[in-house]
């Protein structure tokens, strides 16, 4: 079975030699100004947010949150413990943050065009918040080689709606016998709205290959 993972986090490829990691876009760092507002909380929305952030001293003695398991692990590798929601993603994070946010000052580390749900939630419940944009996603200029690679896929894993959009616009050949797997309900709904069937899998399973096989 040929399984293709579109995540830009190449560390996922360690999970199995069966899974081929082929990112559909690149991550480009953006210079930023750090908003030192005596913050009480910092949120990292992605692995790329961690990898392109430079002021980790700010994480000392404050609350650190990560959107999901991969982001938490990336922070842990740097010696930083982060809290994560039971359900990865914005909805789970909002539940974890709760509604008693007055007197708290947040910085959200994210990419250009990243989700604003956590930002809006904090404002709604009286917290102060600044977005810190430290990277952007950039499409490749040509997908001809990837189109040939993906023609051999039995299953494709989408870790973001951005990757899914690029795939269906530049790579997918109609009537291909391939199954689509998504790491969250949000990504699955996006793929379904494009007119394709998809299933949500536990991306952080101990055996991701088995997880994919059971979903097909």
What are these regions (language model features)?
Residues 1-216:
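Signature of uroporphyrinogen-III synthase
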